[in-house]
Every structure is written in C-alpha cells, then in structure tokens.
UniProtKB/Swiss-Prot annotation:
Compartments reported by the entry: Cytoplasm, Nucleoid
Similarity comment: Belongs to the YbaB/EbfC family.
Compositionally biased intervals (Low complexity): 7-16
Assembly information from the UniProt record: Homodimer.
Protein's UniProt name: Nucleoid-associated protein SSP2277
Pfam families cross-referenced by the UniProt entry: YbaB_DNA_bd
Sorted UniProt keywords: Cytoplasm, DNA-binding
Function in brief: Binds to DNA and alters its conformation. May be involved in regulation of gene expression, nucleoid organization and DNA protection.
GO molecular function terms noted in the UniProt entry: DNA binding
InterPro entries: YbaB-like_sf, YbaB/EbfC
Biased composition, class Basic and acidic residues, residue ranges: 20-33
Amino acid sequence: MRGGGNMQQMMKQMQKMQKKMGEEQEKLKEEKVQGTAGGGMVTVTVSGHKEVLDVEIKEEAVDPDDIEMLQDLVIAATNEAMNKADELTQERLGKHTQGLNIPGM
C-alpha cells in the first residue's frame, strides 16, 4: 500500500496549492494595472481579474474629425492593460503551479 500513501500526500499538496491559488486570486481582484496609449493621452485601468475599472481620455485626444484615432488609442490602452493583468496573474499564480503541467496555467 505504499502507492496509497504517496497518493494521499499528493492530494494534500494539491489541496494546499488550491487554497493558496484561491487566496492569490482574491488578492488579484484588488490589484490594478494600467495601459496607456498616445503618450498618455488615453489610460485604461483594469483589475487583476481583467475588469475595466476606469478609462481616462485627455482632452487633446478628442478630435471630432478623427474619431477613429481615439478609438484606436482606447483599444491599444485596453489591450496593454489586459496584457499586464495576464502577466500579473501568471506571476502570482505561476509560483504555485511551477513544475506542474496544468493546461491554461
């Protein structure tokens, strides 16, 4: 029954890891990251859970004759913020899954 003991130990380790990852995910909810575009003319703030929290657009970014530029800036800033949130998530959760081959992590 030696294999059973190893399995129990592995299950305990997995439960411990799940608990730590759950705690990290809760912390991520409170984290904020920003993406900017146009030299800071547009700033998007998202949570660690990739929820858009704020969009700031400086007055000089608004040109009624070139709405497409503003749209592009908002998209670029949002994408940058989302990428930073992904990196933060990977950094925080990755330390708990090192060495494990878990799809999506």
